[in-house]
Amino acid sequence: MFAVIKANGKQYRVAAADEITIDHLDAEVGSVFTFPVLMLGGATVAIGAPHVDGATVTGEVVEQTRGDKVIAFKKRRRQNSRRKRGFRADLTVVRITEISGLGETVKAEPKSKRAPAPEAAADA
């Protein structure tokens, strides 16, 4: 099952356990958000007008970060005129934990802890 959600004026196609990078949300790491659902897909499809009634997508904020630097450079030739400006967008990484609607619910499996690294043989 997948869903199309709206976050900060943009649309994202998500499934359970996906991690998406969206524009900055004012939220602390670990907080939970519910996003409006524009469309649900799977065995049956539901398209909202504008939202699908009773459908929810829940996500947990994983990280607050910044994007790559974008350089804006303007030059007017033969005028000795140039301008250089950099920009880095504030971004939020969100992990989709649950999609529910159309009578079914899909939950993301909790991230399993990484198995400990095999230790070197102590007898060697």
Curated annotation (Swiss-Prot):
Keyword field: Ribonucleoprotein, Ribosomal protein, RNA-binding, rRNA-binding
Its job: This protein binds to 23S rRNA in the presence of protein L20.
NCBIfam families, per the entry: L21
Keyword Lyase included in the entry's annotation: no
A Gene Ontology biological process term: translation
Family: Belongs to the bacterial ribosomal protein bL21 family.
Pfam families, per the entry: Ribosomal_L21p (PF00829)
Gene Ontology molecular functions: rRNA binding; structural constituent of ribosome
Keyword NADP: no
Superkingdom of origin: Bacteria
Biased composition (Low complexity): 115-124
PANTHER family, sorted: 50S RIBOSOMAL PROTEIN L21, LARGE RIBOSOMAL SUBUNIT PROTEIN BL21M
Protein name: Large ribosomal subunit protein bL21
Region Disordered, residue ranges: 105-124
Subunit description: Part of the 50S ribosomal subunit. Contacts protein L20.
GO cellular component, one term: cytoplasm
